[in-house]
Amino acid sequence: MTKQLVLFCDFDGTITENDNIIAIMKQFAPPEWEALKDDILAERISVQEGVGKMFSLLPSSLKGEIIDFLRRTTRLRAGFREFVAFTKERGIPLYIVSGGIDFFVYPLLEGLIEPERIFCNGSDFSGETIRITWPHACDGECQNGCGCCKPSLLRKLARPDGYHVVIGDSITDLAVAKQADYVMARDFLLQKCQELGLPHAPFATFFDVIDALQRMEVIV
C-alpha cells in the first residue's frame, strides 16, 4: 500500500530562524523571565507553567508593540515559501504545531498557511497582563504539561495510511519525534535523534527538507 506523507512542522526556531518567545522576553520582559526559562529547560516546571508565567510579566497593552517588533525582526528560514508551495503542489498535508502564541504565529504565517492548519497556544488580553490559553493541551496519554501538546496533536491528526514526518529543532519537539515515522531535525533535536537512534535527517534550510521529501515519495 502506498503511504501518504503527512507533515508536522514546528514554528519557533524551525520555520523562523530565532525563537520568538525568547525574542519577546529579551525585548519586553523584566529580568524575572530568565529564571523561568532556566526552570523550563531544567524541567523543574512544565512548559505550560513556565510560558504562562513568563507572559504574565507583560502588560496586555504591549500587544501591538510586540507584533510590530516581530514583524520587523523575524526572518523565515530559507526555502520555507518554496516548501509550502511544494506541499500544495503534491497534495501533502502540512500542519504547523507550535508552542508559540496565536497573536504572533498567525500574523507571521499570514498568506502562507491556512489558519485551520495552524495549532498553537491562545492568548487573552482582556486583563492587565497577558494570559495564555491552552486549546491544544495534553490528552489523557500525556502528563507533561506541554501547553500545545504535539504528541496529542499527532495522535489526533494521524492517518491510517500516513507516513508521519516531524520537522523541528528543540526539546519541545522531542516527544512527538519519538512517535513519528521520520524526523527532519536541526540543533538540539538533531543531537537527540542521533543519541536515541531515531530515523532522521539533518536540515539547515527548507530546501534540504524538500530534497528529503522528494526522496521519501519514491520510497513510501
From Swiss-Prot:
Pathways involved: Amino-acid biosynthesis; L-methionine biosynthesis via salvage pathway; L-methionine from S-methyl-5-thio-alpha-D-ribose 1-phosphate: step 4/6
GO cellular component terms, semicolon-separated: cytoplasm
SUPFAM superfamilies for this protein: HAD-like (SSF56784)
An annotated GO BP: L-serine biosynthetic process
GO molecular function, one term: L-phosphoserine phosphatase activity
Domain of life: Bacteria
Signal sequence bounds: none
Pfam family for this entry, one: HAD
Alphabetic keyword roster: Amino-acid biosynthesis, Hydrolase, Methionine biosynthesis
Catalytic activity: 2-hydroxy-5-methylsulfanyl-3-oxopent-1-enyl phosphate + H2O = 1,2-dihydroxy-5-(methylsulfanyl)pent-1-en-3-one + phosphate
TM spans (from-to): none
Entry's EC annotation: 3.1.3.87
HAMAP family: Salvage_MtnX
NCBIfam families named in the record: DKMTPPase-SF, HAD-SF-IB, PRK09552.1, salvage_mtnX
Function noted in UniProt: Dephosphorylates 2-hydroxy-3-keto-5-methylthiopentenyl-1-phosphate (HK-MTPenyl-1-P) yielding 1,2-dihydroxy-3-keto-5-methylthiopentene (DHK-MTPene).
Family, as annotated: Belongs to the HAD-like hydrolase superfamily. MtnX family.
Name of the protein: 2-hydroxy-3-keto-5-methylthiopentenyl-1-phosphate phosphatase
Organism: Geobacillus kaustophilus (strain HTA426)
Gene giving rise to this polypeptide: mtnX
